[in-house]
């Protein structure tokens, strides 16, 4: 019988049995695919998947060939999660035919298809692989780089890779692949051996057989191998041995296992990157070209890749080589090679040449692996075979270049060769497993020998290599690792499933529902029908444990049978099984702790192997015990426990602890059946006595024992404590005391058990676990369970101080007397007392208390990896209270002692990585240091909440400190810990990719549908309504800028007008109004700049340009197309272009846009082509055009549509600003004849496209001072007209464009133009500006300019009218901000009448502007400075425009003077606009506003005709633009009024150009809806000069002086500068007060300014810091002296700055003056604070739901609950305190303290932990470090109420003193003198001892208390015990023999 019993008990029950069918199989049938039709035709499904017993085809991963019927295969892995997320589900990759199906489980839902792929040819293999995207190719870089997770699908000729992000790659394979493996670095390929390569006698050198590919875009390179030889030297060579097959590859550690088919041995190699010296060896070696003999000396591994040598190739075209690559090899080899290789088309060969990761010369890897007997090294071919292929520049590769190998394998271990090595003993399955103590084994299954070979390996001490140990053989038919619990499942030949840990056998696995095969062979007994028949009773558990010893053998092979017989008997056993029915055929797909079993009938089941322990307490204790025991014993201990725990019908969660205690104590030698507190353990955890297992009955008649048993059961305790029982007043039926004396005689320990010698060590680590659990408030129940075990052990080990320690913690649980088990004194010698064992119990509370009191403490012992909280608490107290900063950077031994028995390298290493202190974050104070350090070690708010409140207090205090003034650059985790959600959300948003904005405005649908879309619906109205809250100016702007509605044509019909004439009159009026309508889109583009995130599936809406009108009173339509009046041709073409630009500029730069979407927006109708051209230009300006495919750009340009070319060229140039991008340069050069070689074909490029291309060159080369470009552009400014009418019209705009482009190329370089001195740039420009003789054209374009134009007779002088503007602005830009006086003097306005007559007045504007821009620092924002630019002669003689009579003087030309005057003033104003652009400078605004008003007055003056209205309008427009630049984005009301006034003027001189200027001014004023402003960087000024060029077009098609498209370049000067505070709780924009600090400059000192956000910030380079000011919001500081990157990223993401409202405060919207805030109210009635506070008002000042509910339920009286008013008042005042001091997290601490004091008053303290916490709180507030902090920060808010703590202290003192007076003194005396105590007094005594820090009685006798006569003597004696005086005062009466206690 016993035999059978043991067989049963060592069974391990598997759980969760489920039938398994691969998910992909089912999905395949429904997946749309031609192949699943074939699947249906093959056979019925049931037949299809069944297989005969031996073959096991299901899921086989053998090579699939096309001729066989379709096979399936699949693999499973653990679900891959995000960092920090714990997942427990499977992912499956299923392959059948051409399909690959990837499915995933999830925590919450069923398995679902994640991705399915269908490829063109049958899939040979599919696998997961992570590629590393790294610039740095070193080994170290691997940890930090981003990983691209891919799925790879191998077909016969190529491999497809699909990344999770959706990128697809395809790589053609240059050889037939036998197998592909994922590695840590990428993919590893094994080449198939072609038939002729196998004979070893072949004289030709073999090719490499293994190759690697590190990224889908990298090349396939050969693998190198480094094998150590006998003499210590090692060789490096290619892997060429065909006999060497990879059988296993692992990523961590990165090792490869190979099998040598010739020698029949397995070897292990480490896989790593090639070192550079190894590269050189291989490459040099291969270039020497040695003969095969001297190569063959180094074993069979020598190998070199071949490639075609030049002489071989009869083919001249480089591309033919690729397709006919094998044609040469036919001569040297059998044709079969050719037939086996995949044929690869030219396109495939070339496809990888375009990949960005490759050089110019690598077309494909294909030709390089070809065979040729000439050359020894892999070479790359040059592209051309001509003799001078390398002479024509560096564009081509050097003639041959070897392939550089990337990975290398290093030999680690080879199995020893035995004599009887069988053929084909290749491992069929290999895996790595570790045992329960973390020792690692590499296991490989040799199926032919039915053996599992396990090799132990470990890392060397320096972590550089792996050391392999001995091999252990386990007989096995199949095996699989169970990673989760560090074990492996082995299927024995007999069909048994056995669990091993490492090589130690744990036990058989019992699978419910499957017959156990072992019964037929080992037992003749019939098996019970159900597995749960024989439930073991509690009594024989110790027997059960004893019997385990015999079964758990350390030897892996059962000694019951002879191993030789084992092999013989296998087959006949199998026969017996088949008669029995199904048996297990194989094991596969292990994930976590789940495996699939394949059964003999073809079905599969998936089972779960139970975990080692489910309850946290048992897990922690097991970890601690495992940590302290020697490895062998630890494994045995865990195996025993696992067998008990996992037996069929194992324990429930509740009773697991009881089982653990029993098991552990039995292993220590206890007889748990005889021990009072363990004998009645309930192993079921049930509440019903019926189900509770009874003891085995000794007799039929029954006895009193049954009743005793019931009374002692847990069930009885449960019932007894039940409320019903109390209410019925049933007297407790006591169990008759288990006659203790019966037991106590013979309760001794059995010293022969496994753990007997280790009892002290186990006791000590369990004590440390106990102290650790005290730091987790959620583990209270576990502590009570653990303390019972510890007390028993402490008593038996006679450790008095420990028993006393537990008594003080749990006075009711720990009786001072109890059952003691004797340990034979003879045996105690065998006990191992470890060195770390201390006689004084380590106490974490005591340690913290001593630190707070400033006493020295010994280091606290801790278990690495187990007692992490203790470690954290100790170090944080040391840092914050003791102020020791060194410990965060290094492990400090002065506070902690790490307990070790063996050097556990692994754990230590992990720790040091975890606790490293990252110095990236800026910290100043100790509090900040503590918080940042705690975050770095992974401490979170949740951890803080589970710490007891007294221990957590110092940490909370530090957090409170940091919360006040945190740094803005702290990482998200720190901000979360200190409770600043505003900052953590900011940090979190900061990490997000630029996606849809936070403040995206959801436009309510239906608002715009009935009316036409005006292109302005997508603005963020929420923010705009905050910026301009007082009025409706935004609606007004929208009305002024809309062009989608018909205009009102108001014409009065005079009597003399006929109807026909009246219609003409109306249409003429409409034509006038249309000039204005066509000018609106430019301004609208400015207003809506970057305000919209398009939906990628919808086209961009472009509003209509409506040129019709409505005439009142009947609203009749007026149309220009009626034919009554002449309308200019192409009138609307540029207006449409601007409309397209405006629509495109709405798109924000952060939008998700791709090439397809851009093409998708292309209109169907030709008339919309102009709009699309504008749209393309806009996409360039916001940076999206770079995504447009080159092919599409080419398509658009070849269409020859002029506008599209202009838009595209300007767009791509703006997108590539300043990059000197070669491809764009080529694109532009085609359109600029001057950049083409002189002999090239003359292309017919439209003039405007040339202008756009020239400006484009300027943009692409901006600021580069590129000599050739500058030279060409300089010449182009003065390019003369040609003979055949080319370059004869609109020359001015081309010359200007060349000047602007030259200025951009040399932007701000001034006189530092390196290498251009011979060009004389400034002199040449000066000549262009003032005129003179034309210089002779030099260089290659000389020919072009020989014959002059036949139309334009300029002679050989420069036409200044053409060249002056461009040259002037070029000078301005080259010398921008250089303050170069000499150049500026060239630009001074002429000061004599004679000279004035030589200069067009318009050019004086440009000269003045240029001069001021050069003398940047001299510009002053006042009218005096503006006037100072006007020469004296003009100032003195200029007429005042308001005068009636004109002074007459013959010499002076009044017209010239007055025109010169206004233009110079306008030029100075414009420069003022540039200087203060976007600054909202008040002086500049006032000055410019005054001049604008003046010009408006001049216009209506009687003698305006002298100056000319057109000139005055121009100057007014220029001044208005300057004003708008200064106030850009601010929406200033006065400027808006000016713009609105000018909008209404439509007649007379008001042409298209002036309207354009006025509406651009309006757009600038509301730039980007108030979110953008202008920058004054050099680049911005260049862009603004192009956009605001002060010569406006006369009509809508006028591009003579300036190309209209350039007006949109202002975008390059716009930058986001709006800061929008967003309330983090409501997520809505709000007002907040900012304090902005300006850096000091030469004009002003460092100053501070207060702004109410949302507001536009000044330019960031002017600022020092920005601060969100209190008191309403939490303060927040952004320090710009550390760099502006942080703020720039905030501004670019819509400027969202999260802010958090402080408690008791209302937002500025609700309470503008701050009179309603809570603090304002309390100041008014300060005297009755707590009473004045009504709980109802709390909702006004906090949004925390927990606080609101607290106020609702705890602070208001409720019916029938009878709470005392006193408690309600207390709660209300505490709540008020917490909320006003911003410490809501302290509320639980306040309440816990109050509850503890009340419990103490009722004398119901069953445990003293809360009293400890109160004691720690009081000690913290009286600690020295805290007092110092208060002195340093007197203004700091109080962290805990100063009135609350003294009351607490006083109440406790009173309660304990009262207890002393009513008999407590006798109790204390009895305790100190070691006499027995009264049961009822135990808990109060413990409270007294803890609170007053009374030492244990063991410490008292040496002092001799009784002899003391005076208090002074006592004081002296107690000094060394560090006992507080207040405690001594209470003890003195007892010790001095005075009965009256002294109460103070």
UniProtKB/Swiss-Prot annotation:
Region Disordered, annotated ranges: 305-343, 373-396, 994-1016
Modified residues (Phosphotyrosine): 571
Amino acid composition bias (Low complexity), ranges on this chain: 323-343, 384-394
Pathway: Protein modification; protein ubiquitination
Keyword RNA-binding set for record: no
Phosphothreonine modification, residue list: 291, 537
Any single Gene Ontology cellular-component annotation: anaphase-promoting complex
InterPro entries noted in UniProt: Apc1 (IPR024990), Apc1_3rd (IPR048971), APC1_C (IPR041221), Apc1_MidN (IPR046794), Apc1_N (IPR049255), ARM-like (IPR011989)
Keywords of the record: Cell cycle, Cell division, Dwarfism, Ectodermal dysplasia, Hypotrichosis, Mitosis, Phosphoprotein, Repeat, Ubl conjugation pathway
Highest taxon listed in the record's lineage: Eukaryota
GO terms of biological process kind: anaphase-promoting complex-dependent catabolic process; cell division; metaphase/anaphase transition of mitotic cell cycle; protein branched polyubiquitination; protein K11-linked ubiquitination; protein K48-linked ubiquitination; regulation of meiotic cell cycle; regulation of mitotic cell cycle
Post-translational modifications reported in the UniProt record: Phosphorylated. Phosphorylation on Ser-355 occurs specifically during mitosis.
A molecular function (GO) term: molecular adaptor activity
Biased composition regions of type Polar residues, renumbered to the chain: 998-1007
Biological role: Component of the anaphase promoting complex/cyclosome (APC/C), a cell cycle-regulated E3 ubiquitin ligase that controls progression through mitosis and the G1 phase of the cell cycle. The APC/C complex acts by mediating ubiquitination and subsequent degradation of target proteins: it mainly mediates the formation of 'Lys-11'-linked polyubiquitin chains and, to a lower extent, the formation of 'Lys-48'- and 'Lys-63'-linked polyubiquitin chains. The APC/C complex catalyzes assembly of branched 'Lys-11'-/'Lys-48'-linked branched ubiquitin chains on target proteins.
Subunit structure: The mammalian APC/C is composed at least of 14 distinct subunits ANAPC1, ANAPC2, CDC27/APC3, ANAPC4, ANAPC5, CDC16/APC6, ANAPC7, CDC23/APC8, ANAPC10, ANAPC11, CDC26/APC12, ANAPC13, ANAPC15 and ANAPC16 that assemble into a complex of at least 19 chains with a combined molecular mass of around 1.2 MDa; APC/C interacts with FZR1 and FBXO5.
Disease: Rothmund-Thomson syndrome 1: A form of Rothmund-Thomson syndrome, a disorder characterized by sparse hair, eyebrows and eyelashes, juvenile cataracts, and poikiloderma, a genodermatosis presenting with mottled pigmentation, telangiectasia and epidermal atrophy. Additional features are short stature, dysplastic nails, and skeletal and dental abnormalities. RTS1 is an autosomal recessive form not associated with an increased risk of cancer.
Protein family membership: Belongs to the APC1 family.
Name of the protein: Anaphase-promoting complex subunit 1
Organism encoding this protein: Homo sapiens
Taxonomic placement: Eukaryota, Metazoa, Chordata, Craniata, Vertebrata
Gene it is expressed from: ANAPC1
């Amino acid at each position: 019988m016993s035999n059978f019993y043991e067989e049963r008990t060592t069974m391990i029950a598997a759980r969760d049995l489920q039938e398994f069918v691969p998910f992909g199989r089912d999905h395949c049938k429904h997946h749309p695919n031609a192949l699943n039709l074939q699947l249906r035709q093959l056979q019925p499904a049931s037949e299809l998947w069944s297989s005969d017993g031996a073959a096991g085809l299901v899921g086989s991963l053998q090579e699939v060939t096309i001729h066989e019927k379709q096979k399936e295969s699949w693999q499973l892995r653990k679900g891959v999660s995000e960092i920090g997320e714990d997942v427990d589900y499977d992912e499956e990759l299923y392959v059948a035919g051409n399909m690959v199906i990837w499915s995933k489980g999830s925590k919450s839902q069923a398995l679902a298809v994640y991705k399915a792929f269908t490829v063109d040819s049958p899939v040979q293999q599919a696998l997961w692989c992570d590629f590393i995207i790294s610039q740095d190719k070193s080994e170290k870089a691997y940890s930090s780089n981003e990983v691209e997770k891919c799925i790879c699908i191998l077909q016969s000729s190529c491999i497809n890779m699909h990344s999770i992000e959706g990128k697809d790659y395809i790589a053609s394979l240059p050889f037939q692949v036998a197998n592909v493996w994922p590695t840590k670095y990428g993919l590893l390929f094994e080449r198939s051996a072609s038939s002729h390569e196998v004979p070893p006698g072949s004289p030709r050198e073999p090719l490499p057989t293994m190759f690697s590919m590190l990224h889908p875009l990298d090349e396939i390179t050969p693998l190198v191998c480094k094998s150590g030889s006998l003499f210590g030297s090692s060789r490096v060579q290619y892997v060429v041995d065909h006999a060497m097959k990879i059988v296993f590859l692992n990523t961590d550690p990165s090792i490869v296992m190979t099998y040598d088919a010739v020698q029949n041995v397995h070897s292990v190699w480490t896989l790593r990157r090639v070192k550079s010296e190894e590269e050189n060896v291989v490459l040099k070696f291969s270039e020497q070209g040695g003969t095969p003999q001297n190569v063959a000396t180094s074993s069979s591994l020598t190998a070199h890749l071949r490639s075609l040598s030049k002489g071989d190739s009869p083919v001249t075209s480089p591309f033919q080589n690729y397709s006919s690559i094998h044609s040469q090899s036919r001569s040297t080899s059998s044709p079969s090679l050719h037939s086996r290789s995949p044929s690869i088309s030219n396109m495939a060969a070339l496809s990888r040449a375009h990949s960005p990761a490759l050089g110019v010369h690598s077309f494909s890897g294909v030709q390089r692996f070809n065979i040729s007997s000439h050359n020894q090294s892999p070479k790359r071919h040059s592209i051309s075979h001509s003799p001078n292929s390398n002479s024509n520049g560096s564009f081509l590769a050097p003639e041959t270049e070897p392939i550089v190998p990337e990975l290398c394998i290093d030999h680690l271990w080879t199995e020893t060769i035995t004599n009887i090595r069988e053929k084909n003993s290749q491992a069929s399955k290999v895996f790595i497993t570790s045992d329960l103590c973390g020792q690692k084994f590499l296991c490989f299954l040799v199926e032919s020998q039915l053996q599992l070979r396990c090799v132990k390996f470990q890392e060397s001490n320096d972590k550089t290599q792996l050391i392999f140990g001995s091999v252990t053989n386990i007989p096995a038919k199949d095996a699989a690792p169970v990673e989760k619990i560090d074990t492996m499942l082995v299927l024995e030949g007999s069909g048994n499933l056995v669990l091993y840990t490492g090589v130690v056998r744990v036990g058989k696995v019992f699978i419910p529902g499957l017959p156990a095969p072992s019964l037929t062979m080992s037992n003749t007994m019939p098996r019970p029908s159900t597995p749960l028949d024989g439930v073991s009773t509690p009594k024989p558990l110790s027997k059960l444990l004893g019997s385990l010893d015999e079964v758990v053998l350390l030897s892996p092979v059962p000694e019951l049978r002879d191993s030789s017989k084992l092999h013989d008997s296998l087959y006949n056993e199998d026969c017996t099984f088949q008669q029995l029915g199904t048996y297990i055929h194989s094991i596969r797909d292990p994930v976590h702790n789940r495996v699939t079993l394949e059964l003999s009938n073809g079905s599969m089941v998936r089972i779960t192997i139970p975990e080692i322990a489910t309850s946290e307490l048992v897990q922690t204790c097991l970890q601690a015990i495992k940590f302290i025991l020697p490895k062998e014993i630890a494994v045995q201990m865990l195996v025993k426990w696992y067998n008990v725990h996992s037996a069929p019908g194992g324990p429930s969660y509740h009773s697991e602890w009881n089982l653990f205690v029993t098991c552990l104590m039995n292993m220590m030698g206890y007889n748990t059946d005889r021990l009072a507190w363990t004998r009645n353990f309930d192993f079921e955890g049930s509440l019903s006595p019926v189900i509770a297992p009874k003891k085995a009955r000794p007799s039929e008649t029954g006895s009193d024992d049954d009743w005793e048993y019931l009374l002692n059961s847990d069930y009885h305790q449960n019932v007894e404590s039940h409320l019903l029982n109390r209410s019925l007043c049933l007297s407790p039926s006591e169990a008759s005391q288990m006659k203790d004396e019966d037991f106590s005689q013979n309760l001794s320990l059995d010293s022969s058990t496994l753990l007997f010698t280790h009892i002290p060590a186990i006791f000590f680590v369990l004590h440390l676990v106990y102290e650790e659990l005290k730091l987790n408030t959620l583990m209270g129940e576990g502590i009570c369970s653990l303390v019972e075990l510890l007390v028993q052990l402490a008593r038996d080990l006679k450790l008095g101080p420990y028993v006393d320690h537990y008594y003080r913690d749990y006075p009711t649980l720990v009786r001072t007397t109890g059952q003691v088990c004797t340990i034979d004194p003879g045996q105690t010698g065998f006990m191992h007392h470890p060195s770390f064992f201390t006689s004084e119990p380590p106490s974490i509370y005591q340690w913290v208390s001593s630190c707070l009191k400033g006493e020295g403490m010994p280091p606290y012992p801790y278990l690495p990896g187990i007692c992490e909280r203790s470690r954290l608490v100790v170090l944080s107290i040391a840092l914050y209270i003791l102020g020791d900063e060194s410990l965060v950077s290094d492990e400090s031994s002065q506070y902690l002692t790490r307990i070790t028995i063996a050097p556990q390298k692994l754990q230590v290493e992990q720790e040091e990585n975890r606790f490293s202190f990252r110095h990236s974050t800026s910290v100043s104070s100790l509090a900040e240091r503590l918080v940042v350090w705690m975050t770095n070690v992974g401490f979170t708010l949740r951890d803080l909440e589970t710490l007891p409140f007294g221990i957590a207090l110092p940490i909370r205090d530090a957090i409170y400190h940091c919360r006040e003034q945190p740094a803005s650059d702290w990482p998200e985790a720190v901000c979360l810990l200190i409770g600043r959600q505003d900052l953590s959300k900011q940090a979190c948003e900061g990490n997000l990719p630029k996606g849809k904005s936070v403040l995206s405005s959801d436009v309510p649908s239906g608002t715009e549908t009935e009316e036409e879309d005006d292109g302005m619906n997508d603005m963020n109205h929420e923010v705009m309504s905050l910026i301009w809250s007082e009025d409706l100016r935004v609606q007004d702007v929208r009305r002024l800028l809309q062009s989608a509605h018909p205009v009102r044509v108001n014409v009065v019909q005079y009597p003399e007008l006929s109807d026909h004439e009246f219609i003409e009159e109306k249409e003429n009026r409409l034509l006038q109004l249309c000039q204005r309508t066509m000018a609106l889109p430019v301004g609208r583009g400015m207003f809506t700049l970057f305000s919209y995130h398009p939906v990628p599936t919808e086209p961009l809406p472009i509003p209509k340009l409506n040129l019709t009108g409505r005439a009142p009173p009947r609203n009749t339509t007026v149309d220009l197309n009626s034919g009554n009046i002449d309308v200019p041709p192409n009138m609307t073409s540029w207006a449409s272009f601007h409309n397209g630009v405006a629509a495109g500029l709405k798109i924000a730069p952060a939008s998700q846009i791709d090439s397809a979407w851009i093409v998708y927006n292309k209109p169907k109708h030709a008339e919309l082509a102009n709009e699309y051209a504008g749209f393309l230009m806009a996409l360039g300006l916001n940076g999206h055009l770079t995504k447009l495919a080159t092919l599409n750009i080419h398509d658009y340009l070849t269409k020859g549509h002029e506008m599209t070319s202009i838009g595209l060229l300007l767009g791509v140039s703006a997108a590539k600003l300043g990059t000197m991008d070669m491809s764009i340069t080529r694109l532009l050069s085609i359109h600029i004849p001057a950049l083409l070689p002189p002999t090239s074909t003359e292309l017919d490029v439209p003039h405007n496209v040339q202008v756009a291309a020239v400006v484009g060159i300027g943009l692409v080369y901006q600021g580069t001072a590129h000599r050739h470009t500058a030279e060409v552009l300089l010449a182009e400014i003065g390019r003369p007209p040609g003979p055949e009418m080319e370059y004869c019209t609109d020359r001015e705009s081309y010359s200007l464009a060349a000047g602007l482009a030259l200025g951009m190329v040399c932007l701000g370089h001034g006189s530092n133009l390196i290498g251009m001195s011979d060009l004389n740039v400034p002199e040449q420009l000066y000549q262009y500006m003032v005129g003179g003789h034309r210089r002779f054209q030099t260089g290659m374009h000389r020919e072009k300019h020989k014959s002059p134009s036949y139309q334009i007779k300029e002679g050989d002088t420069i036409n200044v009218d053409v060249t002056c503007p461009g040259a002037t602005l070029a000078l301005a830009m080259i010398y921008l901000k250089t303050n170069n006086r000499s150049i500026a003097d060239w630009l001074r306005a002429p000061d004599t009448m004679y000279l004035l007559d030589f200069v067009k007045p318009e050019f004086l504007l440009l000269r003045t502007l240029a001069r001021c821009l050069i003398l940047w620092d001299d510009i002053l924002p006042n009218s005096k400075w503006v006037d100072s630019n006007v020469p004296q002669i003009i100032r003195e003689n200029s007429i005042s425009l308001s005068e009636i009579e004109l002074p007459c003087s013959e010499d002076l030309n009044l017209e010239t003077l007055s025109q010169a005057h206004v233009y110079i003033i306008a030029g100075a104003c414009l420069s003022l606009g540039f200087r203060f652009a976007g600054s909202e400078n008040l002086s500049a605004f006032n000055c410019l506003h005054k001049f604008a008003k003046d010009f408006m007055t001049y216009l209506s003056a009687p003698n305006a005709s002298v100056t000319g209205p057109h000139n005055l309008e121009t100057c007014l427009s220029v001044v208005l633009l300057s004003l708008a630049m200064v106030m850009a984005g601010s929406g200033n009301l006065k400027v808006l009024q000016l713009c609105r006034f000018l909008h209404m003027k439509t007649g007379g001189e008001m042409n298209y150009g002036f309207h354009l200027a006025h509406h651009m001014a309006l757009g600038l004023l509301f730039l980007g809806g108030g979110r953008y402003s202008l920058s004054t960087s050099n680049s911005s000024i260049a862009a603004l000069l192009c956009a605001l060029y002060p010569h406006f077009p006369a009509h809508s098609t006028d591009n003579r002086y300036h190309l209209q498209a350039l007006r949109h370049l202002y975008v390059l000067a716009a930058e986001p500068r709006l800061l929008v505070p967003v309330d983090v709780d409501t997520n809505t924009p709000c007002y907040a007060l900012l304090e902005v600090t300006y850096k000091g400059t030469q004009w002003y000192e460092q100053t501070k300014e207060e702004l109410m956000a949302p507001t536009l910030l000044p330019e960031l380079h002017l600022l020092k810091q920005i601060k969100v000011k209190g008191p309403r919001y939490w303060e927040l500081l952004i320090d710009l002296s550390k760099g502006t990157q942080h703020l720039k990223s905030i501004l670019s993401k819509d400027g969202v700055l999260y802010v958090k409202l402080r408690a008791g405060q209302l937002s500025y919207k609700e309470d503008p003056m701050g009179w309603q805030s809570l603090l304002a109210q309390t100041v008014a009635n300060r005297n009755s604070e707590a009473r004045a506070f009504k709980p109802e008002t709390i909702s006004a000042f906090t949004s925390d739901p927990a606080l609101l509910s607290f106020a609702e339920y705890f602070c208001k009286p409720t019916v029938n609950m009878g709470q005392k008013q006193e408690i309600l008042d207390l709660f209300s005042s505490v709540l008020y305190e917490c909320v006003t001091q911003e410490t809501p997290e302290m509320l639980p601490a306040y309440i816990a303290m109050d509850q503890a004091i009340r419990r103490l008053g009722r004398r119901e303290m069953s445990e003293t932990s809360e009293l400890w916490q109160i004691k720690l709180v009081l000690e913290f507030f009286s600690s020295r470090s805290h007092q110092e902090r208060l002195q340093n920060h007197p203004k700091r808010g109080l962290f805990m109420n100063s009135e609350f703590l003294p009351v607490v202290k006083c109440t406790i003192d009173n309660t304990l003193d009262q207890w002393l007076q009513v008999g407590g003194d006798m109790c204390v005396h009895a305790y100190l003198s070691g006499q027995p105590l009264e049961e009822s007094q135990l808990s109060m005594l413990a409270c007294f001892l803890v609170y007053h820090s009374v030492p244990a009685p063991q410490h008292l006798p040496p002092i001799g208390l009784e002899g003391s006569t005076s208090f002074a003597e006592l004081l002296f004696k107690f000094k060394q015990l560090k006992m507080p005086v207040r405690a001594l005062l209470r003890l003195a009466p007892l010790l001095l023999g005075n009965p009256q206690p002294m109460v103070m």
